[in-house]
């Protein structure tokens, strides 16, 4: 398990309610450490990507490297309602600043988990996590079917990789790789903030055939149209990779990110969209990105991240 650490398992602790027996279990009671030998019953495998090197390169506010541990701490005391096992397979770090190597290790880990029948849920880290996550799925599938990428995000993250990869380049990197291997780049970005993306980025999204919806068009009234759009996108996909940049949420709900949203998309809109994606039966991989515990207020952002993890593991 190259550069993965299991030392964080001590954070899985919380309240005990013995008077209610098995019905009072919480996440910390059920999460299992990844077995160092042998095989595990297929389930959800948490993978920490404790890296914000891409955020630093993108001139953002660093701190997201601490997110996997902080999310676990809030998740540990959450009530347990799942029916399949959940494993914690540890954290991958990028202390040496070698993001390419970190991406390669994450891709290897994700591919291995998928090969063993697990659902990998990656806890970032900056949104540079997406390139490693996608590469793991790509390696696992080896050209078997079309992958649709659904990104809830205020930003396209389609910046060109001029010198180095960053948290702003992952989907352009994926597009380049798709071109190189002769596979379609099928990308949806939901929650785009016009003020956070230049005209050049909108033009690039159009040129790449990206389906995007601006934050102002994501409301309760527009939910039926959004679900219909998702249906069309998913119908053109054999497999779905879901990535959630937490800065898509309103800044009042999600202050703990490098770039809080002035408007954002409400959780009440995002949750049914996630459920709709899950109901398709095509979701193979998911990750959360950009939570920065250094910028959080009273753990508000961590609680939202933990809630999303809970939903993604149902």
From Swiss-Prot:
The pathway noted for it is: Amino-acid degradation; L-histidine degradation into L-glutamate; L-glutamate from N-formimidoyl-L-glutamate (hydrolase route): step 1/1
| Positions contributing to Mn(2+) 1 binding | 127, 153, 157, 245
Underlying gene: hutG
Q: What is the name of the protein in this document?
A: Formimidoylglutamase
- Which catalytic reaction applies to this protein? N-formimidoyl-L-glutamate + H2O = formamide + L-glutamate
The organism is: Aeromonas salmonicida (strain A449)
State its role: Catalyzes the conversion of N-formimidoyl-L-glutamate to L-glutamate and formamide.
Cofactor(s), by name: Mn(2+)
Residues annotated to bind Mn(2+) 2: 153, 155, 245, 247
Q: Name one GO molecular function term.
A: formimidoylglutamase activity
Cross-referenced SUPFAM superfamilies: Arginase/deacetylase (SSF52768)
Which keywords does UniProt give here?
Histidine metabolism, Hydrolase, Manganese, Metal-binding
Which InterPro entries does the record match to this protein?
Answer: HutG (IPR005923), Ureohydrolase (IPR006035), Ureohydrolase_dom_sf (IPR023696)
Q: List the HAMAP family hit by this protein, alphabetically.
A: Formimidoylglutam
């Amino acid at each position: 398990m190259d550069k993965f650490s299991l030392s964080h398992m001590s954070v899985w602790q919380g309240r005990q309610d013995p008077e209610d027996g098995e019905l009072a279990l919480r996440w910390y009671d059920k999460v299992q450490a990844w077995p160092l030998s042998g095989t595990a019953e297929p389930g959800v495998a948490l993978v920490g990507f404790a890296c914000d090197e891409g955020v630093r390169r993108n001139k953002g506010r660093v701190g997201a490297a601490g997110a996997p541990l902080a999310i676990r701490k809030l998740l540990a005391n959450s009530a347990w309602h799942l029916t399949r096992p959940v494993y914690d397979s540890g954290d991958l770090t990028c202390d040496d600043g070698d993001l390419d190597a970190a991406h390669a290790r994450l891709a290897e880990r994700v591919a291995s988990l998928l090969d063993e029948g697990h659902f990998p849920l990656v806890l970032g880290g900056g949104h540079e996590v997406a390139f490693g996550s996608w590469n793991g799925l790509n390696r696992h599938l080896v050209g078997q079917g079309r992958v649709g990428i659904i990104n809830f995000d205020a930003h396209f993250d389609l910046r060109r990789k001029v010198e180095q990869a960053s948290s702003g380049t992952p989907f352009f990197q994926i597009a380049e790789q798709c071109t190189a291997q002769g596979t379609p780049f099928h990308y949806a970005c939901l929650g785009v903030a016009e003020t956070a993306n230049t005209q050049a980025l909108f033009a690039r999204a159009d040129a790449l055939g990206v389906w995007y919806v601006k934050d102002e068009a994501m409301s309760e009234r527009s939910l039926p149209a959004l679900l219909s759009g998702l249906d069309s996108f998913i119908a053109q996909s054999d497999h779905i990779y879901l990535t959630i940049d937490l800065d898509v949420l309103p800044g009042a709900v999600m202050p703990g990110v490098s770039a809080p949203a002035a408007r954002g998309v409400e959780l009440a809109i995002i949750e049914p969209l996630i459920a709709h994606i899950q109901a398709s039966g095509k979701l193979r991989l998911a990750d959360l990105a950009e939570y920065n515990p250094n910028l959080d207020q009273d753990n508000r952002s961590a609680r939202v991240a933990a809630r999303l993890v809970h939903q993604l593991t149902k």
